[in-house]
């Protein structure tokens, strides 16, 4: 389905940006209400990463920001791009499918077994990142069981002419060129960003090339806006394959698949608008996303060349009613989501490899509402919401053959309460129900007879926590538990996915910040996660009480910032990831993956409008891997080794 943007744009301009007056604009933020507003409260227990924190950190990609500053668990991306697989609350290999990534409130997580295209988001275009752990299904639907990550880009509305250009060179023939431009007047703003990245990466046959461009044109004032945004990226990556246990000792950097590659091109266009009419705010988002990917694999059993085309159109109207009765502030959000997703896969094969001629469609229609109440006198915040969603999935596979279709009617709800306790302390509790729909890769069938499409995954979520905010210091603690039925999981013996018996995810999350002196600041995070099978069997093995693979029980991070001089700053990040089960070890018969600690540093110095920086990743040259898979007899494993010590130099000019 294609939407003609021209008449729609005219309608939005008339509705949202008519009769604009020249005014001084408030700071615009985006919150989990799916509205932009002036200084609206953050969601209960949300973590916010600001643009200044990103600029001062040792992170150079969005994935590194989420891992180093946000405490989000990530693993190596097999194709060598910065699109790190993410996992918020212990889902292991399916962490990506349970963590929803948004840009300006619009979904960019894929309906396939691929990571969200984080590499297409320029760091210098980000205003802030909101990480909300726990279910986000009420507002966003499927795939948000463990939480949402909302990346909010800068608005150029009212911004003076400004920009930046930067160059970074480093190990493995790294070349990274970036540029950004902003200009605006009282009622308009334009932002443009571009990047060109080239690197050979650590492994043989692992070169990665990335070109991105994005921008936004916005018209509006404090009572409304209309914005037309676009992003496009072109990725070309070589695929080295995994290393065996013996090869990790003898040839870590070698390639098992010297001919394999993955190329991908995608575009995203969106038209967004809001208009405030007294106590009501009307909003409408229309977005279109397309992707074309080519992937070649060559093995001893044959080769495959897969060509896939994906397209998704979304429409999201909503209304926010903000009013006050006595000392109670009400924020009632009512909205609808409609999306239409299409997929085509044409795979040619030789030898014993399987060819594939596959297509699929998914149509989602949802209605949701959420009411946020703030009782100012007692310092109490209450959030209550629900969602009803209808999903129609169809999947056609010509070679098996298979024609499958399913309809699902799904519900989600959430109740959250936060209470101010005085002296900077607050406590909160949250309970909710979420769901996830299996994507087309998870529903794929390789050999007849094919089963029906997988059942939706459902989760009952509970969380309690406390926060303290003082002068120059803060601390937070939370405990969560998720009881999941029909968790969607890969089953290696049949090369397919199944619905697991009941699982439980529970954990403790701690975070703290301290301004030690005027020039020294510390931030620390610790997470203990336990993901286990509550009952049932897997491949004929009783797995009751066993650990879910690829979920480290202990993770910790420490960020140190030292303003050595007014123009010189040192940033240090230390990340610890504890032991975890190898992929494919649901019976827990093999030893655990080794724990690892990685230290990254960045020294930055400002000279006028210039910033020069030296960065070193994996400072102590640790040998480690973040992904490994055990063989079928539980006697050995394969893994993807991570980069050892590497460095870069960068120069940035701002005007």
Regions found by a protein language model. Name each.
Residues 62-65, 84-89, 99-102, 116-122, ...:
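N-terminal periplasmic accessory domains that precede
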């Amino acid at each position: 389905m294609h939407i003609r943007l021209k008449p729609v744009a005219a309608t939005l301009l008339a509705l949202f940006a008519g009769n604009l007056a020249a005014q001084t604009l408030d700071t615009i933020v985006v919150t989990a209400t799916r509205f932009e507003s002036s200084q609206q409260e953050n969601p209960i227990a949300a973590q916010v990463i600001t643009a200044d924190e990103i600029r001062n950190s040792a992170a150079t990609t969005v994935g590194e920001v989420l891992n180093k500053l946000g405490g989000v668990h990530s693993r190596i991306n097999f194709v060598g791009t910065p699109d790190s697989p993410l996992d918020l609350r212990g889902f292991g290999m399916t962490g990506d499918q349970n963590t929803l990534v948004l840009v300006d409130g619009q979904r960019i997580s894929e309906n396939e077994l691929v990571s969200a295209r984080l590499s297409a988001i320029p760091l210098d275009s980000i205003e802030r990142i909101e990480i909300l752990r726990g279910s986000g299904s009420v507002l966003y639907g499927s795939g948000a069981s463990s939480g949402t990550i909302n990346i909010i880009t800068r608005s150029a509305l009212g911004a003076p002419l400004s920009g930046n250009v930067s160059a970074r060179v480093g190990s493995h023939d790294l070349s990274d060129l970036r540029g950004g431009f902003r200009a605006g007047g009282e009622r308009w703003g334009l932002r443009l960003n571009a990047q060109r990245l080239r690197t050979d990466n650590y492994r043989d046959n692992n070169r990665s090339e990335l070109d991105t461009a994005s921008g936004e044109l916005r018209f509006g004032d404090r009572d409304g806006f209309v914005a037309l945004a676009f992003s496009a990226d072109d990725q070309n990556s070589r695929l080295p394959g995994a290393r065996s246990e013996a090869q990790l000792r003898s040839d870590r950097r070698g390639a098992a698949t010297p001919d394999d590659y993955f190329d991908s091109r995608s575009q995203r266009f969106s038209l967004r608008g809001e208009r405030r009419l007294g106590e009501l705010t009307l909003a409408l988002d229309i977005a279109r996303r397309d992707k074309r990917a080519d992937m070649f694999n060559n093995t001893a059993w044959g080769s495959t060349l897969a060509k896939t085309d994906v397209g998704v159109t979304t429409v999201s109207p909503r209304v926010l009613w903000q009013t006050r009765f006595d000392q109670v502030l009400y924020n009632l959000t009512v909205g609808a989501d409609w999306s239409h997703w299409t997929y085509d896969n044409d795979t040619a094969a030789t030898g014993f490899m399987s060819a594939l001629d596959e297509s699929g469609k998914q149509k989602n229609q949802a209605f949701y509402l959420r009411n946020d109440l703030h009782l100012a006198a007692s310092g109490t915040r209450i959030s209550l919401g629900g969602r009803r969603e209808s999903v129609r999935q169809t999947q056609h596979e010509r070679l098996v053959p298979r024609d499958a279709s399913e309809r699902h009617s799904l519900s989600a709800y959430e109740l959250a309460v936060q209470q101010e306790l005085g002296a900077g302390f607050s406590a909160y509790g949250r309970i909710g129900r979420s769901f996830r729909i299996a994507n087309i890769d998870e529903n794929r069938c390789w050999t007849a007879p094919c089963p029906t499409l997988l059942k939706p995954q459902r989760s009952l979520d509970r969380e309690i926590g406390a926060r303290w905010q003082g002068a120059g210091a803060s601390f937070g603690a939370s405990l969560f538990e998720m009881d999941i039925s029909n968790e969607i999981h890969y089953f290696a013996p049949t090369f397919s996915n199944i619905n697991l018996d009941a699982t439980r995810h529970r954990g403790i999350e701690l975070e703290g910040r301290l301004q030690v002196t005027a020039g020294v600041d510390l931030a620390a995070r610790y997470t203990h996660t336990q993901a286990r099978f509550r009952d049932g069997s897997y491949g004929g093995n009783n797995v009751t009480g066993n650990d879910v693979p690829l979920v480290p029980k202990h993770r910790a991070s420490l960020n140190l910032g030292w303003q050595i001089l007014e123009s010189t700053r040192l940033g240090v990040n230390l990340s610890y990831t504890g032991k975890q089960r190898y992929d494919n070890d649901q019976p827990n018969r093999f030893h655990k993956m080794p724990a690892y600690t990685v230290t990254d540093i960045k020294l930055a110095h400002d000279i006028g409008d210039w910033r020069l920086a030296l960065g070193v990743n994996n400072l102590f040259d640790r040998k480690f891997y973040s992904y490994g898979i055990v063989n079928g007899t539980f006697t050995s494993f394969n893994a993807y080794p991570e980069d050892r010590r590497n460095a870069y130099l960068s120069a940035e000019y701002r005007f």
